[in-house]
A protein has these predicted regions:
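A generic structural motif
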Residues: 38-45
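Short beta-strand
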Residues: 32-35
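Short, low-order "capping/linker" segments at domain edges
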Residues: 46-57, 77-83
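Short amphipathic alpha-helices in soluble, non-transmembrane regions
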Residues: 19-27, 54-62
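Generic alpha-helical secondary structure
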Residues: 13-21, 49-52
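Short loop/turn motifs enriched for small/polar and acidic residues
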Residues: 45, 71-73
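Short glycine-/aliphatic-rich beta-strand segments at the starts of folded cytosolic domains
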Residues: 1-10
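Short acidic amphipathic segments
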Residues: 30, 59-71
Length: 83
């Protein structure tokens, strides 16, 4: 299992940002913090590094998202940490 802590930067003027964040809130893999001034902290829990990367790439390509910044990543017992 992998756990990633990320900071998501949004374009507050883009109405699509709220839709993207609503999609994240509906996804049980994501735990979202407070959205303030276009910045949101979040935790992503996945079953693999591959799934983690796929989720982060998807998010980075969504409308209203300016950037996705990985703060910390840890992947279970396999010894792989960070990227």
């Amino acid at each position: 299992m992998g756990i990633c802590s990320v900071v998501i930067t949004t374009d507050e003027a883009d109405p699509n940002a709220r839709g993207t964040l609503a999609a994240l809130a509906a996804d049980p893999r994501w735990t979202l913090g407070d959205w303030r001034r276009g910045t949101l902290s979040a935790v992503l829990e996945t079953s693999s590094v591959r799934e983690d990367r796929r989720c982060l790439r998807w998010l980075d390509d969504q409308p209203g998202i300016v950037g996705v910044h990985l703060v910390f990543a840890h992947y279970g017992d396999d010894g792989e940490e960070g990227r």
